[in-house]
């Protein structure tokens, strides 16, 4: 890598001061400002990337990067000073669409870019490539960072470009966990879904498929299987647990959703592990072989068995060995001054429950991006206080007999109380030993009912469990929970 002195000696340099923030705990306190570093942009900046300096660099082009860019623009700090380095071929987009509307059949109005660029998912402006250009934000497409030197503040991309940063935000997200190649994990017709290219490949396969197997009973598996129903395909979901969505759903709740999927023709094979995927004479996947020896025919396989944080060359920044990801404090500062991490890759303190965590969800991606940039650009030192939130919307294609939309807030710990018949509503409440409401789940709620959920989960009020158990409807149960907010027993 060329030296810093080479850039400093170039003619016509433009210098600026970069604020570097100190480290420490996540409490609301004064944050020391470190001595200013002065950087100089090479005179050849317009012609190439030989030691081209940037005041701010975001590595990663996913949801969090798009929302971070918006916050930079809101502060008037993006014009000519911000660069996004991405492995994606497109500007940041709302990734949840890839397992929902993007997979709809062509005759059922599938989602396509530029329709779901950030920040439309939160009601904001659609940030197309033109938006980034108009706001002076440089985006390097399909050119991920492959090398990092924290001492010299230097990044190297896969194409050989060299960037020097003042402040760095790591927003590399996650990658899909894969089946080993030796058991057929890379066969033609085996799909993983994480970006638009993955989704395009899957859509192409769905258009020719007859029998599909979905491996995994979590978010990806359930959303892809629901989309496959729109194509009228023979669909089987295989997973090792006793029921779908085991990290969130209770057995009772899972049973109701499983029955709905079965009504749409989906078959379940529970408590099963994949031994291998076999190829046919054409080399394409033809079946899934289970550990018990049974064989499930399939011409298309979708694997949804989780995701792993993309640390890449940034391991030296500091990895949390318990939850994975790059460890940060409540302002998203890493162990190295001037380096931050946001979104799926960030291991951060979950203030509400006093534990370190990592959240793979678009809501956290959006909020962590905003919080981090606010902390970077202002004197804001309020610790990030995230309320866990998950949701899913499936069977929303035209012609579907029943649309599904549920939301969950809080922590799914403690005793559960389920109310409702799933026609269409159902609610589940998680109550701890002190009768405090810790988490709440609602299917098919109204906008007013959904807006109540975060209030309940955040306040953690003491509820009357006997009344809640005797509620005759979801509406009645929510009103009982709402009344507990005013009892003076909230956290």
From Swiss-Prot:
Keywords: Chloroplast, FAD, Flavoprotein, NAD, NADP, Oxidoreductase, Plastid, Redox-active center, Transit peptide. Its main location: plastid. It catalyses: 2 monodehydro-L-ascorbate radical + NADH + H(+) = 2 L-ascorbate + NAD(+). NADP(+) binds at residues 219-223, 247, 306, 360-361, 391. It is an enzyme of class 1 (oxidoreductase). It is found in: Plastid, Chloroplast. It comes from the Eukaryota. Catalyzes the conversion of monodehydroascorbate to ascorbate, oxidizing NADH in the process. Ascorbate is a major antioxidant against reactive oxygen species (ROS) and nitric oxide (NO). This is Monodehydroascorbate reductase 5, chlorplastic. The gene is MDAR5.
């Amino acid at each position: 890598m060329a030296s810093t002195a080479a850039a400093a000696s170039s003619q016509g340099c433009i210098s600026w001061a970069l604020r570097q923030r100190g480290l420490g705990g996540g409490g609301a306190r004064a944050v020391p400002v470190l001595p200013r570093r002065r950087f100089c942009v090479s005179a050849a900046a317009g012609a190439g990337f030989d030691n081209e300096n940037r005041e701010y660099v975001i590595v990663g082009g996913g949801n969090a990067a798009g929302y971070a860019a918006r916050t930079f623009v809101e502060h008037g700090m993006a014009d000519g000073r911000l660069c996004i380095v991405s492995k994606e071929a497109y500007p940041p987009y709302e990734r949840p669409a890839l397992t929902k509307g993007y997979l709809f059949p062509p005759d059922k109005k599938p989602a396509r870019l530029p329709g779901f660029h950030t920040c439309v998912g939160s009601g904001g402006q659609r940030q197309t490539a033109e938006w980034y250009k108009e706001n002076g934000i440089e985006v390097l497409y399909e050119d991920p960072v492959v090398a990092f030197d924290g001492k010299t503040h230097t990044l190297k991309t896969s194409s050989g470009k060299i960037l020097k940063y003042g402040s760095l935000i790591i927003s590399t997200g996650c990658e899909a966990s894969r089946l080993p190649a030796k058991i057929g994990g890379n066969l033609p017709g085996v799909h993983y879904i994480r970006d638009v290219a993955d989704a395009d490949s899957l859509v192409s396969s769905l258009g020719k498929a007859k029998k599909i197997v979905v491996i995994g009973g979590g978010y990806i598996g359930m959303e892809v299987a629901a989309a496959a129903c729109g194509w009228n395909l023979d669909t089987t979901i295989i997973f090792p647990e006793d029921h779908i969505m085991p990290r969130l759903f209770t057995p009772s709740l899972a049973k109701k959703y499983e029955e709905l999927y079965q009504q749409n023709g989906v078959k379940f094979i529970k408590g099963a592990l994949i031994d291998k995927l076999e190829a046919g004479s054409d080399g394409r996947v033809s079946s899934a072989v289970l550990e018990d020896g049974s064989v499930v025919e399939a011409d298309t396989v979708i694997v949804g068995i989780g995701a792993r944080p993309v640390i890449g060359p940034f391991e030296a920044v500091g990895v949390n060995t318990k939850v994975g990801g790059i460890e940060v404090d409540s302002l998203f500062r890493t162990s190295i001054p001037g380096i931050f991490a946001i979104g799926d890759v960030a291991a951060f303190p979950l203030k509400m429950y006093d534990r370190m965590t990592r959240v793979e969800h678009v809501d956290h991606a959006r909020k962590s991006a905003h919080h981090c940039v606010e902390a970077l650009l202002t004197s804001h030192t309020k610790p990030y206080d995230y309320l866990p939130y998950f949701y899913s919307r499936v069977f929303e294609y035209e012609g579907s007999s029943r649309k599904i939309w549920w939301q969950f807030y809080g922590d799914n710990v403690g005793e559960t109380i389920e109310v409702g018949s799933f026609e269409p509503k159902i609610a589940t409440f998680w109550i701890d030993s002190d009768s405090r409401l810790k988490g709440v789940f609602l299917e098919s709620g109204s906008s007013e009912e959904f807006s109540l959920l975060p209030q309940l989960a955040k306040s953690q009020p003491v509820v009357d469990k006997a009344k809640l158990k005797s509620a005759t409807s979801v509406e009645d149960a929510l009103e009982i929970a709402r009344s507990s907010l005013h009892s003076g027993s909230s956290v």
